[in-house]
Amino acid sequence: MVFIFMFLFAFSVFPQTCRQLAKEVKPTLSPETRKAYDVKLAEAFDQFTKQGGNADSTIWLGRRTAYLGNYKDAIRIFSEGLSRYPTDARFFRHRGHRYITIRCFDEAIRDLDRAASLVKSKPDQVEPDGLPNERNVPTSTLQTNIYYHLGLAHYLKGEFDPAYAAFMQAFNIAKNADMQVAAANWVFMSAMRLGKSKEAAQFIGKIPDNLDLIENADYYKLIRLYQGKMKPEDLLKEAASNATIGYGLGNWYLYNGRREETMKIFRQIVAGDQWASFGYIAAEAELKR
């Protein structure tokens, strides 16, 4: 009886963390993709062992673990890395991303704020892609990813002022069109939520036509929608199976007073299978507000 009391008392004194309570939904992967990811994870573990768990090998082990949907395990790996490399901003950046994935937004903000402070006044660095694009050209950097994910975490909490500031920082330091387009999409949406429709229109209107993009065509389509160069009907079919397009289109309806259509699209997104995508997480957050 005493043991039971002490056990229950311990749980009352030490409540479970968001990570412990969070849901984890693994992605739907084809057998071929899963096999390829498993091979890459095995290679990452082999490098981790051979290199004595140095910073680079630990980060790759965490990233490869997350690609298979083991987000909490990835967070634990990044946390272990931080215990050995507490001033390496990359660990806070990647752990912050995966806290967003499991909907622990406060934890994500703390990590990403810390990452931002660690890279302040330092040169930026290209971030290698774990899932290379068709040109095998990385499109993001450590600092753009820190501010981009920080903006997302604030946005998902409905904190649009700091979201706007973080996305604008990501946009301003972006070194290529792909990252600029991704950040610009969220700058626009944050500004619209703040009631800055004139400022949002002026900003998004400056994004040029015919950009040479490698991987962010979806965000570019949404920008063209906001610019009035595409119609919502042009994206409806794609929105049914693409959470990124769906969330942007739902917001366009919201900005134009068509709330019923907005909610319909958001519900359609969360009925799908893109649980870890930012469009899905954002639609889910909207429906809970």
Task: Describe each PLM feature range.
Residues 13-60, 67-68:
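N-terminal leader/linker segments that initiate helical-solenoid repeat arrays
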Residues 52, 86, 120, 141, ...:
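Short coil turns that delineate tetratricopeptide repeat
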